[in-house]
Amino acid sequence: MISSSKRDELIVSKIRKGTVIDHIPAGRALAVLRILGIRGSEGYRVALVMNVESKKIGRKDIVKIEDRVIDEKEASLITLIAPSATINIIRDYVVTEKRHLEVPKQIRGLIKCPNPQCITNNDVEAESRFTTISIKPLKLKCEYCEIYITEEDVIRQIL
């Protein structure tokens, strides 16, 4: 007979090289794929695990992408919708780099201000700049027009 802990395990094969994004809040894996521009026809082998138990955050999603390493801009965007996420870089089936994401104090040029009157929406040269007010829940303040945006606003922009 299989023990309870063995029955509850979810097995997804290891990847030889690529990226594993772990500890994504449940239900956010599809938004992560959207950030990465993965729609399914790019040729990457992708494993998507959604809504599994996690000791760290209750329920979580996991994304594994073979033969793809994410860049800093992508990691910064993922941080905004999954601040508890961990990015693992895999080489020869071994984690060679592990990064715990953190929401930065300043966010520049990654997202747009939703205020149509904001200078960043009316001047091509103006780069959006936000200050992080809180992380849980995510609350950002535009440095130009002082409007506040939430995690849900960021997700709407991504989707």
From Swiss-Prot:
One of its GO terms (molecular function) is metal ion binding. Pfam families: PyrI, PyrI_C. Binds 1 zinc ion per subunit. Its cofactor is Zn(2+). Keywords: Metal-binding, Pyrimidine biosynthesis, Zinc. Transmembrane segments: none annotated. Belongs to the PyrI family. Involved in allosteric regulation of aspartate carbamoyltransferase. Contains catalytic and regulatory chains. This is Aspartate carbamoyltransferase regulatory chain. It comes from Saccharolobus islandicus (strain L.S.2.15 / Lassen #1) (Sulfolobus islandicus).
